[in-house]
Amino acid sequence: MFIHEIFKNADPKSLAMTGESNVTYGQLEKAVENYRNTLHAMGIRRGDTVGLYTANRAEFVYVYMAVVSLGAIIVPINNSLVDREVDFILRDAESKLLISDMPLTVSVPFIDIHDLDYRASTENAPKAPALPADLTEDDVCALIYTSGTTGSPKGAMITHKNQVRNVEQYTAVVRFKPEDKVLCVLPMFHCYGLTTVVLGSLYHHSTIVILRSKSPTEIINTIMKYSVTIAIMVPPLYNLLARRGEPSSMKTVHTFVSGGASLPQPVAQSFYERFGHPVQEGYGLTEASPVVSILPTAKPKYLTSGPALPGVEVKVITDKEGPYVPGTVGELAVRGDNVMKGYWKKPEETKKVLDKDGWLRTGDLVYMDADGYIYIVDRIKDLIIMNGENIYPGEVEDCIYEVEGVGECAVVGHPDPLRGQSVWAYVVMKEGFAFDEDKIRTVSYTHLRAHETCADL
């Protein structure tokens, strides 16, 4: 199956997207066909790369599906990047065209998405030819840029198979039904929002509820207005909602999923206490399309991202010989149909993370328990080394979160001329709580080893 075929056979009258406007599956299919014809008339062909820089909107989906249905390659770009950063990606990807919802100064041809929509709706361009017979599911359909496990932004080459399989793997655990209404507050340009919300919804003919604002009030109002049933978000949003939402505001939601970063246990607990719903934490990375694991509702555990998805293999690489001993920290490696083809035109960078047997080294430090559940410790590059001792920022952050009134915290390594690095923590208090350095230090001294305590707060 090709990624643009995932919404075929849906009831044409059922709702595909809502929010700013209602779009049925019949209208979606027609819009994609019109965009496809217009883009072909503009010269887009198989293998061309097309940049897409927009906020969450229905037209993002039209463009995405139209481009890949031509055998071309879509390059979704973070719409918070400035012109210079966007131009770097476009030049690196050798893009033939940029489609955007705002003006940008870049070195490739540009068309405003509103103009493209008008042309697709009114020009009646000649019908684009069918896909070449030799196009396969192993062809690249998307370049998703990431800093990856090393260095500067690189384009992860994601194939049709990668995306389709990851949607199938993910929704084997997080169940979608046609009657579900799925909140789309995650950015569509990001592989997390793209796969888990947009593609997951379309594959199962659910309704995408599009929201651009990340305001807790707007999220709550949208959930209530559209009777959202599945909410997929990032930890900071759960943190905000746990402090502000009314318990009754989430009564229509049967599934909450968190990803993009580790969900602090105090946040998960606060959310559960307020709304009575557990949050299924997942783990992934762009190079894996992106989902690798998720916590099932049938066998929930705290502080874990769950076992690997069906069809995904994982292992922990350590410096110890012999069989893996549960609880041992090492680097997570992943293998499966969801793993990228490689980095765009960077074979040497690809070799650093992807071996000949298909194992992707994630750059994440984890351990697994006897049941195969994955526990994220930290990014290798975030590891703090002080006097030769390894310090995991996540462990220090979890300790600081135990202090009453702490809303958010981040722990980083700071250069230290004597010890190599020292531990610095940045803390944001909840409304109504004063910052109390002595209290935080007392908790730290009680629960952490001496070298893990913060040099500065």
Map each language-model feature to its residues.
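Conserved beta-loop-beta connector loops within the AMP-binding
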Residues: 315-333, 352, 370-371, 433-437
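Conserved AMP-binding/adenylate-forming core of the ANL superfamily
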Residues: 13-57, 61-65, 82-87
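AMP-binding/adenylate-forming catalytic core of the ANL superfamily
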Residues: 81, 98, 231, 336, ...
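Conserved AMP-binding/adenylation subdomain of ANL enzymes
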Residues: 164-181, 189-230, 240, 244
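Conserved small/polar residues in nucleotide/adenosyl-binding loops
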Residues: 146, 446-453
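Conserved AMP-binding A3 loop
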Residues: 24-26, 141-165, 295
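Conserved pre-ATP/AMP-binding loop-to-beta segment of ANL
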Residues: 127-145, 152, 175-181
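Gly/Ser/Thr-rich phosphate-binding loop
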Residues: 228-233, 242-301, 313
